Amino acid sequence: MEELVGLREGSSGNPVALRELWGPCPRLRRGIRGGLEWLKQKLFRVGEDWYFLMTLGVLMALISYAMNFALGRVVRAHKWLYREIGDSHLLRYLSWTVYPVALVSFSSGFSQSITPFSGGSGIPELKTILSGVVLENYLDIKNFGAKVVGLSCTLATGSTLFLGKVGPFVHLSVMIAAYLGRVRTKTIGEAENKSKQNEMLVAGAAVGVATVFAAPFSGVLFCIEVMSSHFSVWDYWRGFFAATCGAFMFRLLAVFNSEQETITSLYKTSFPVDVPFDLPEIFFFVLLGAICGVASCAYLYCQRTFLAFTKTNKLISKLMATSKPLYAALAATVLASITYPPGVGRFMASRLSMREHLDTLFDNHSWALLTRNSSPPWPAEPDPQHLWWEWYHPRFTIFGTLAFFLVMKFWMLILATTIPMPAGYFLPIFIIGAAIGRLLGEALSVAFPEGIVAGGVINPIMPGGYALAGAAAFSGAVTHSISTALLAFELTGQIVHALPVLMAVLAANAIAQSCQPSFYDGTIMVKKLPYLPWIRGRPINSHRVIVEHFMRRAISTLARDAALEQVVKVLTSTDEAEYPLVESTESQLLVGIVQRAQLVQALQAEAPARASGQQRCLQDILAGGCPTEPVTLTLSPETSLHQAHNLFELLNLRSLYVTSKGRAVGYVSWVELEKAISALTNPPPAK
């Protein structure tokens, strides 16, 4: 029953709900409502986006800090248990392995039972969404809890599994951004806008990185490089504003909790500012970049191959389909057993956390020179003042432990990436790169113990600077991004190695991008997610191939004057999601697009008229309310493959019709583009 409506006394005749008249204090409530409307208008005069973006940054900072706060205590509890359980090797081994195995099993089982979209990094799927593909339920807020709980359990394993949180945090941030975007449309009464939604998603991705590393600048640039091929300058301020709010709040919480005296960088370094490196060292930094580029190609190939193997192998694929927690437990058992400190873990600094790994690798002292004449002890517990002692072994030396660490973490990280649970893979890659740089820096410090003479001034070589460059170069090569150089500077708060680090990153990217797809693109390929192959920089002569060579010519058109029986015949004989609407069967002039679902619904409503024997055509259905979409963009048969590819990337298109003098002559979608690019990159053998 509709609510009765009356007239307010003394009013001009505008109707008012009787509930408002009969409610208590009607004038007071009207005044409060009017005041709120006035406040809303004043606040939103500067743009409502500011408030939602600030809310996004603050929320993600609170979540990130709360997760770090809780996980720090869980990890300390594990270390306490391992330390206090006694001298029995069996008990110590069980305390070291059972703890992460239980957490990983729960993480995999819980997250996968709630939603299958919560596993993995999340960035490959987000990249697919931002390219125009709709992945149902992937950004639903119900996935948020599963991702948070699963990620917390993953991170609680510490450095045993050697996994991070960048990717999942980007996914979490984007989910909140999508939710806030829906709240925004309801608050201001605006219709949903696809482009506006994408703007919020891009800002959310930047906030995810910024609230992990407290690095707003590199957070925005990293997300632009990794997730989109084209980026609107208009979105820059949204990303930077939200990322700055998130990073500021994240570091401010550390000050409030008395962890820091003021807002500082996450990883403190002490590189000399006057002469941080000698000019001849530039060559070794570029060499380091080349080494990282080659190593990244090997890693990307092995990781993609092994991930594909787990999906094609009958035993593993069956295990993954029926019991993901069991596979996760088996993999975690292998990884935890290897890192057991009294065993193999002694030679790879397994007692250090991932944060302590970076803190020690960025140390500017040469460990090889410090241990040349003396052997530091291996204490029962890591010494906070001498954490680098964990990297030393009398027989292996510094070089042996660093090399062994790299070899073991190389394949252990590949194995960890196959575990179906929420986990990030950027920070482990960053640490591996730092170890590569540290190894080269230690070798140079031994080869040149007095430093490299340049202009009569002798300056000792700092392996920490090479570790910084290696971290940026290897992570940048794996992800095909340059912004990792800026991330390294924001993490350490120093920019004295700006040029050598950037040169190392460029050298590594030059090799990696010419040989292998990025980590995220490779994952998209293995998971068989919809994606548009990239062609920029590839010598495939895409300018010489035109649309006429690869377009789909067989298209089912619907003419305005077509009889309904003919329309029904087309619908039953094809399964297209949309159909091109032409002026007439003879002219084939493209005038619009009609969606299949809406056309079927209109035909079902028209069924009684058709049963009465009335002769009706498609034009009558369209005039009766069946909506059509205008054709805003088409391709010409003479358009090159390169131009068509750029249009699809720039506008996030899924398909376009091809017209010649207004006539619909073909159709191009991702499928046709992918086949055309594949034919150029892998041409068929000549007969």
UniProtKB/Swiss-Prot annotation:
Expression tissues: Expressed predominantly in the kidney.
Domain CBS: 551-612, 628-686
Keywords: Calcium, CBS domain, Cell membrane, Chloride, Chloride channel, Ion channel, Ion transport, Membrane, Metal-binding, Repeat, Transmembrane, Transmembrane helix, Transport
Gene Ontology BP terms: transepithelial chloride transport
Protein residues bound to Ca(2+): 259, 261, 278, 281
Transmembrane segments: 52-72, 161-181, 202-222, 236-256, 282-302, 325-345, 396-416, 417-437, 452-472, 486-506
Domain of life: Eukaryota
Gene Ontology molecular function: metal ion binding; voltage-gated chloride channel activity
Catalytic activity: chloride(in) = chloride(out); bromide(in) = bromide(out); nitrate(in) = nitrate(out); iodide(out) = iodide(in)
A cellular-component GO term for this protein: chloride channel complex
Annotated compartments: Basolateral cell membrane
Cytoplasmic side: 507-687
InterPro entries: CBS_dom (IPR000644), CBS_dom_sf (IPR046342), Cl-channel_core (IPR014743), Cl_channel-K (IPR002250), Cl_channel_volt-gated (IPR050970), ClC (IPR001807)
Membrane topology (UniProt): Multi-pass membrane protein
Subunit composition and interactions: Homodimer. Interacts with BSND.
Protein's job: Anion-selective channel permeable to small monovalent anions with ion selectivity for chloride > bromide > nitrate > iodide. Forms a homodimeric channel where each subunit has its own ion conduction pathway. May conduct double-barreled currents controlled by two types of gates, two fast gates that control each subunit independently and a slow common gate that opens and shuts off both subunits simultaneously. Assembles with the regulatory subunit BSND/Barttin for sorting at the basolateral plasma membrane domain and functional switch to the ion conducting state.
Family per record: Belongs to the chloride channel (TC 2.A.49) family. CLCNKA subfamily.
Protein name from the UniProt record: Chloride channel protein ClC-Ka
Organism listed in the record: Oryctolagus cuniculus (Rabbit)
Phylogenetic lineage: Eukaryota, Metazoa, Chordata, Craniata, Vertebrata
Gene it is expressed from: CLCNKA
